[in-house]
């Protein structure tokens, strides 16, 4: 505890770090305030139907990422997800399309062009998602006894503009946090949205256990299990297999370079949360089509509408394993890694440079991906197991899935950046032993 207090004091002593933390706090407060500003023409008291719809599935994920703005019909309802969707599309195009590959190699100018294209694509996605959200909102409001006229009218046009402007403003806040605050701004906004739901979830679970059964001991056991799941997620995020690399000695004038041994850190979960996001998007398709299909098809889709059911989670876990292999194969290029080693006079001891090195790295990644994908699938379905044992829906979401991995990853990245600022000013880090915090970026090749 003394070490922790001393670290906080050191953080406050550094003017730049103190300024960044206060700036981050200011932007977070602005974001949270906007999450409660309801769209004009919407009666906030009639939003219970929409909030009930977001208790499970992809809707719950969107609502959690937006910190409740989605179910509040806020001007920030669409949140940062359209920008993330656009970024994922551009990332995939960078791998598959030569034009984007060339742009990526242009350095800072290429990065600025790709950022601009990402923003344009974000606007296009918002122009589609805005009216779609309003149609869904009108259906849910009708169930609550309040009509919302959605069509080519002033309400739809003005609300779509507000939703698009709100989402772009959230994106701007994220970029400002990255530039002037602490951590990656976009990831930090998602983290805030997730954490904002935690106090309400834990109070609801506490009240449920006291009133409906289980008592205080069961609640304490749930907290202990939650901490254990967090520790497990940290191990999954930070787990790496280090491949030793030797660099050949070379003489430049009278000086000798090379001859040192380094490591290539290959992550157990190189794909991070992307397989879960892809799998959830696929699992949402039958639910979205349920209203347009026959009664026989609806009977089939009902099995997938229950995200606590066996078939939903079995298919969900299988899709995560498949997408983990798929996405890892996209982002990890053993041939390129072997070529880079060869160009820098590096080699893996006992392995011939070139093709043999690429095959060796590919074999290691294949062996790592199998346990990594299975562990990722287990984390993804843990909320369903929690629900099976009587944990409330809102609290069960913190036992696994995308939200847990994002929380762990962003917190580690933010703490690593704070620790780096401390070390730059010759202060100690968070640990007395000298151990350093490793974020996700520190383990990328």
Where is each model-derived feature located?
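N-terminal cationic and glycine-rich segments that engage phosphates or anionic surfaces
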Residues: 1-104, 109-445
């Amino acid at each position: 505890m003394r070490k922790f207090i001393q670290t906080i004091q050191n953080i406050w002593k550094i003017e730049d770090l103190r300024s960044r933390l206060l700036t981050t706090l200011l932007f977070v407060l602005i974001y949270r305030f906007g999450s409660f500003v309801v769209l004009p023409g919407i009666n906030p008291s009639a939003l219970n139907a929409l909030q009930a719809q977001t208790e499970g599935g992809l809707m719950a994920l969107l609502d959690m990422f937006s910190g409740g703005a989605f179910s509040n019909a806020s001007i920030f309802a669409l949140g940062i997800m359209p920008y993330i969707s656009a970024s994922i599309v551009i990332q995939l195009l960078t791998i598959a399309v030569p034009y984007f590959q060339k742009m990526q190699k242009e350095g800072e100018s290429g990065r600025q062009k790709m950022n601009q294209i990402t923003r344009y694509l974000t606007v296009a996605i918002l122009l589609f998602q805005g009216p779609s959200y309003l149609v869904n909102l009108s259906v849910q409001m009708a169930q609550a006894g309040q009509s919302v006229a959605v069509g080519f009218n002033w309400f739809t046009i003005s609300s779509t503009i507000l939703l698009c402007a709100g989402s772009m403003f959230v994106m701007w806040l994220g970029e400002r946090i990255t530039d002037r605050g602490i951590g990656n701004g976009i990831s930090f906004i998602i983290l805030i949205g997730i954490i904002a739901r935690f106090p309400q979830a834990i109070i609801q679970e506490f009240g449920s256990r006291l009133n409906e059964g289980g008592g205080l001991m069961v609640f304490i056991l749930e907290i202990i299990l939650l901490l254990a799941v967090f520790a497990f997620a940290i191990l999954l995020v930070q787990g790496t297999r280090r491949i030793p690399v030797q660099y050949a000695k070379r003489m430049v004038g009278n000086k000798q370079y090379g001859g040192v041994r380094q490591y290539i850190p290959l992550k157990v979960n190189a794909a991070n949360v992307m397989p879960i996001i892809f799998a959830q998007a696929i699992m949402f398709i039958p639910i979205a089509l349920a209203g347009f299909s026959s009664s026989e098809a609806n009977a089939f889709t009902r099995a997938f509408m229950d995200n606590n059911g066996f078939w939903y989670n079995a298919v969900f876990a299988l899709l995560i394993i498949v997408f983990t292999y798929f996405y890892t194969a996209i982002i990890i290029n053993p041939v390129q890694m072997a070529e880079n080693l060869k160009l820098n006079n590096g080699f893996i001891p006992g392995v011939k440079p070139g093709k043999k090195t690429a095959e060796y790295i590919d074999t290691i990644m294949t062996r790592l991906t199998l346990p990594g994908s299975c562990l990722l699938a287990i984390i993804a379905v843990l909320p369903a197991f929690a629900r099976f044992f009587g944990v409330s829906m809102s609290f069960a979401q913190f036992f696994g899935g995308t939200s847990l991995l994002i929380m762990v990853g962003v917190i580690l990245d933010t703490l690593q950046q704070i620790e780096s600022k401390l070390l730059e000013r010759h202060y100690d880090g968070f640990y007395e032993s000298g151990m350093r915090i490793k974020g996700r970026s520190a383990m990328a090749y």
